[in-house]
């Protein structure tokens, strides 16, 4: 049962003004029409607090009487929770349950919710141990919790089902103050990750000498928590490596290892493992890691990788690629715009993305600034030219594809270049007549336009003249009928 001070949510005091203010503050929450029971409890607490404020000696006497009248089992339970050596020991809790079993069923029924209330108030409680008592007393099955807040009780029982975030027995070798600090820190961190994910980054950034218990369950949770907010922790890399050693086929182990290496700032040494993971386990998570690495270390590949990821997602039920032109989705264009305005691209990479945003006709690809580049030795030039033609739904020259394919088969291609080249070779289907087709020149095209425009203009004039004659003839006939 809650005391009057707990209901009013203030500390014990003899100042009547503080009691009255607390009562008025709680009154709107317990209106007599909407919550008559809550209002009754609040009113009784207010009157009791006023009485104790007038006679504080009576409160001390009441506390002594309550302590003396408290059931033996309740006192034993408080002793267990305060014990530095037994509070986290399942065997000690089993011993307490055996002591509880010596009482008759009527007494146990009366003790069910008082024991639950004491457990809820405990600051440093092992939920794994509390689950033993919850199972014995059927806290999950009964709803007749006398005098307890229902929401508070449900939240506590839900926490018991989730269990401790790590094995508290791993703390027994440390001083009691460090035990309490560690339990409190990880309990708050887990609640923050579960109910307030927007504040996890700020929580993890808090400075302090935090102990990391030797518990594999906690270590994997830390991997998940840190990776979810894209934060690196060097101490977690060996944890992920050990996980992968124990479970070589685990997709999660490989993901968290790549993620932590990336967020800890690893560069080229990570790329081979990251590409292997991306190819072995296609997923949105793998796509995001690859794009993040490219954005940090090789931004000129970023736009090409976005096309690769979009193309890979466009497959039929049998896993065969669809006839789909990359660059049409809103997400792709948003990512292109993001890297374009990041200031990280080379002039060649910037001109490539700009050409994609302003698509030309397939025959006029020479107008693109990518096509006019003179950096023949650039490893990106062939990639950009072929990729642009894929977006424009045109046929690239075979010699460009041949150079890319030679680099790929010879093992000279950068890992990201290899990924992009394979996508382009899949998307492009050359026709035999395309091999010897040269790029059109602007002069030739303009001449063709001039030659084609002349007969088209004469035909239009003839059509208009005939139309006027027909209309005039029809109007004349109509006029003759009415004359």
UniProtKB/Swiss-Prot annotation:
Keyword Transcription regulation part of the UniProt annotation: no
UniProt feature, compositional bias: Acidic residues: 432-441
Gene, per the UniProt record: djlC
J domain residues: 3-70
Any GO BP annotation: response to cadmium ion
Protein name from the UniProt record: Uncharacterized J domain-containing protein DjlC
Residues covered by region (Disordered): 431-456
Keyword terms: Chaperone
Disulfide cysteine pairs (residue numbers): none
GO CC annotation: plasma membrane
GO molecular function, one term: ATPase activator activity
InterPro entries listed in its UniProt record: J_dom_sf
Bias kind Basic and acidic residues: ranges: 442-454
């Amino acid at each position: 049962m809650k005391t009057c001070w707990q209901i009013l949510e203030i500390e014990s005091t003899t100042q009547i003004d503080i009691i009255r203010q607390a009562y008025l503050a709680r009154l709107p929450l317990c209106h007599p029409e909407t919550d008559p029971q809550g209002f009754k409890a609040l009113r009784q607490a207010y009157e009791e607090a006023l009485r104790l404020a007038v006679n504080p000696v009576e409160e001390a006497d009441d506390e002594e009487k309550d302590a003396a009248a408290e059931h033996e089992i309740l006192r034993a339970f408080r002793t267990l929770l305060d014990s530095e050596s037994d509070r986290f020991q399942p065997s000690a809790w089993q011993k307490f349950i055996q002591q509880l079993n010596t009482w008759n069923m009527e007494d146990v029924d009366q003790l069910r919710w008082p024991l639950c209330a004491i457990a809820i108030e405990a600051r440093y409680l092992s939920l794994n141990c509390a689950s033993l008592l919850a199972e014995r007393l059927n806290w999950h099955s009964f709803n007749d919790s006398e005098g307890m807040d229902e929401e508070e009780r449900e939240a506590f029982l839900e926490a018991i089902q989730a269990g401790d975030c790590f094995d508290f027995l791993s703390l027994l070798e440390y001083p009691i103050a460090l035990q309490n600090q560690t339990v409190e820190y990880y309990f708050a961190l887990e609640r923050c990750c579960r109910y307030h994910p927007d504040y996890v980054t700020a929580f993890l950034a808090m400075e302090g000498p935090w102990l990391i218990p030797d518990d594999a369950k906690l270590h994997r949770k830390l991997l998940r928590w840190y990776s979810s907010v894209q934060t690196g922790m060097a101490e977690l890399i060996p944890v992920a490596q050990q996980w992968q050693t124990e479970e070589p086929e685990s997709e999660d182990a490989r993901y968290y290892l790549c993620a932590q290496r990336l967020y800890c700032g690893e560069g080229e040494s990570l790329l081979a493992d990251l590409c292997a993971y991306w190819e072995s386990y296609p997923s949105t998570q793998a796509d995001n890691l690859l794009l993040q690495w490219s954005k940090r270390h090789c931004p000129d590949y970023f736009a090409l990788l976005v096309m690769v990821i979009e193309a890979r997602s466009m497959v039929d039920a049998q896993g065969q690629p669809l006839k789909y032109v990359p660059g049409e989705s809103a997400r792709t264009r948003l990512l292109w715009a993001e890297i374009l305005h990041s200031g990280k691209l080379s002039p060649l990479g910037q001109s490539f993305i700009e050409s994609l945003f302003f698509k030309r006709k397939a025959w006029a690809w020479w107008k693109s600034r990518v096509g006019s580049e003179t950096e023949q030795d650039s490893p990106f030039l062939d990639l950009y030219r072929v990729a642009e033609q894929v977006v424009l739904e045109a046929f690239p020259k075979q010699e460009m594809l041949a150079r890319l394919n030679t680099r790929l088969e010879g093992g000279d291609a950068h890992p990201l270049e290899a990924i992009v080249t394979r996508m382009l070779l899949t998307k492009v289907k050359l026709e035999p007549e395309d091999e010897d087709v040269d790029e059109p020149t602007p002069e030739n095209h303009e001449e063709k336009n001039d030659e084609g425009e002349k007969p088209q203009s004469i035909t239009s004039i003839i059509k208009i003249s005939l139309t006027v004659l027909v209309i005039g003839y029809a109007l004349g006939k109509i006029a003759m009928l009415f004359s």
